[in-house]
Amino acid sequence: MQREKDSLIVVSGGMDSVTLMYEKRASIALALSFDYGSKHNARELSFARLHAERLGVEHLIIPLDFIGQYFQSDLLLSGGDIPEGRYDEENMKSTVVPFRNGIMLAVAAGLAESRGLRRIYIANHFGDHAIYPDCRASFIRPMTEAVRCGTTNGVLIEAPYTDITKTDIARIGASLGIDYAETWSCYKGGVFHCGVCGTCVERREALHDAGIPDATEYEG
């Protein structure tokens, strides 16, 4: 018996959300992406669209122009240069987009209820905890309860990667046959991955530690 497609997924086009989309594809009716004015939005969104089409999942891109216009973050086109280094270094905090996941989950909740969907998937993971407060379990738990209480049909948020690492996610993706060269991570949003910003460093380490050949094209 085929499982009911009763879920939507917030998908950026990066390793984590693409992996989750493949893992939960049997239940996903809608893939939801956001154009919020980040330096790497265009690069990410092309891969989100690619994988949604490949899986036969409807894909929506919702503009959140106000974030790029009014919020402060070096991740945004309106911000400064992307710092280089690991996620846990102090300078990477400048890439935080305030309450980004909260805003996206709120929009996703309204859309899920409008579509009669019961579940939202989001692919935050343990490696995000160091600098992104809206990726931590301490945020996801109360946000889940708020969405459940604030929707008529009790929409649920499921964040199954919250307590696992990007290396763990890479292993899941490898078991699903995902080609990670068809995902985007780099915050700089250039032609190639820079290889030295926090998300590039994490990507390289995750693939290496998972024993997966890294076919990503890096600058230099």
Curated annotation (Swiss-Prot):
One of its GO terms (biological process) is queuosine biosynthetic process. Gene3D superfamilies: HUPs. GO terms for molecular function: ATP binding; ligase activity, forming carbon-nitrogen bonds; zinc ion binding. Binds 1 zinc ion per subunit. Pathway: Purine metabolism; 7-cyano-7-deazaguanine biosynthesis. It is an enzyme of class 6 (ligase). Its EC number is 6.3.4.20. ATP binds at residues 11-21. Zn(2+) binds at residues 186, 194, 197, 200. It catalyses: 7-carboxy-7-deazaguanine + NH4(+) + ATP = 7-cyano-7-deazaguanine + ADP + phosphate + H2O + H(+). Keywords: ATP-binding, Ligase, Metal-binding, Nucleotide-binding, Queuosine biosynthesis, Zinc. Its cofactor is Zn(2+). InterPro entries: QueC (IPR018317), Rossmann-like_a/b/a_fold (IPR014729). Catalyzes the ATP-dependent conversion of 7-carboxy-7-deazaguanine (CDG) to 7-cyano-7-deazaguanine (preQ(0)). PANTHER family: 7-CYANO-7-DEAZAGUANINE SYNTHASE. Belongs to the QueC family. This is 7-cyano-7-deazaguanine synthase. It comes from Porphyromonas gingivalis (strain ATCC BAA-308 / W83). The lineage of its organism: Bacteria, Pseudomonadati, Bacteroidota, Bacteroidia, Bacteroidales.
